[in-house]
From Swiss-Prot:
Region called Disordered, residue ranges: 169-204
PANTHER family linked to this entry: OUTER-MEMBRANE LIPOPROTEIN CARRIER PROTEIN
Organism ancestry: Bacteria, Pseudomonadati, Pseudomonadota, Gammaproteobacteria, Enterobacterales
Entries under CDD domains matching the protein: LolA
Protein purpose: Participates in the translocation of lipoproteins from the inner membrane to the outer membrane. Only forms a complex with a lipoprotein if the residue after the N-terminal Cys is not an aspartate (The Asp acts as a targeting signal to indicate that the lipoprotein should stay in the inner membrane).
Residues of the signal peptide: 1-21
Segments of skewed composition (Polar residues): 171-181
Superkingdom, natural source: Bacteria
Regions that span the bilayer: none
Cellular location(s): Periplasm
Pfam family, one: LolA
Keywords: Chaperone, Periplasm, Protein transport, Signal, Transport
Organism expressing this protein natively: Cronobacter sakazakii (strain ATCC BAA-894)
The protein, known as: Outer-membrane lipoprotein carrier protein
Single GO cellular component term: outer membrane-bounded periplasmic space
């Protein structure tokens, strides 16, 4: 009887891992259908009690695997750009920019996961699928991300995604007007404007 129980437990664990693997494969396959796109987005941030913290909007350009431009226009302008090697963050209001190597940037943030879409990243999560919804829970609890949810259609269109941090703060993003196709490569380059203070972490 004990042997049967152990066998059943092993089979159950295998079945769960297969479901997670299938969900990860389906998610990657869907995102792979669109190699580059532009979309506008709205953002809503709530705290652990559900109270609104911030609302915003902006535009997003992606060319996988490592080119992206995340341009927040409201409430305050900020820009996050990857040229494939360097990750730039620019805040026009305070006239400051920072530069880090993309390879050193954390890959466990929702946006980096979507932009990279690499199997090695998805393997770090337990993934459950319900139709077009994918719920990701980190296998390691060491990071700040508690849960990540993304809704992506079979044709690769991302409708929305949200992230819950360990303190239960939730950031939700609704994408709209996604346009698939070639993106102007100038969107993925950044030259600090004159007078901007640059914190270059690449040589430290």
């Amino acid at each position: 009887m004990k042997k049967i129980a152990v066998t059943c437990a092993l089979l159950s664990a295998f079945a769960v891992s297969s479901v997670w693997a299938d969900a990860a494969g389906d998610l990657k396959s869907r995102l792979d259908k669109v190699s580059s796109f532009h979309a506008s987005f709205t953002q809503k941030v709530t705290d652990g009690s559900g109270a609104a913290v911030q609302e915003g909007q902006g535009d997003l350009w992606v060319k996988r695997p490592n080119l992206f431009n995340w341009h927040m226009t409201q409430p305050d302008e900020s820009v996050l750009i990857s040229d494939g090697k360097t990750l730039w963050f620019y805040n026009p209001f305070v006239e400051q920019a920072s530069a880090t190597w993309l390879k050193d940037a954390t890959s466990n943030t929702p946006f980096m996961l979507i932009a990279r879409n690499q199997s090695s990243d998805w393997q770090q999560y337990n993934i459950k699928q319900n139709g077009d919804d994918f719920v990701l829970t980190p296998k390691s609890a060491s990071g700040n991300l508690k849960q990540f949810t993304i809704n992506v259609s079979r044709d690769g269109t991302i409708n929305q995604f949200s992230a819950v941090e360990q303190d239960d703060q939730r950031s939700s993003y609704q994408l709209k007007s996604q346009q698939n196709g070639a993106v102007d490569m100038s969107k993925f380059t950044f030259t600090p404007p004159q007078g901007v203070t640059v914190d270059d972490q690449r040589n430290k």
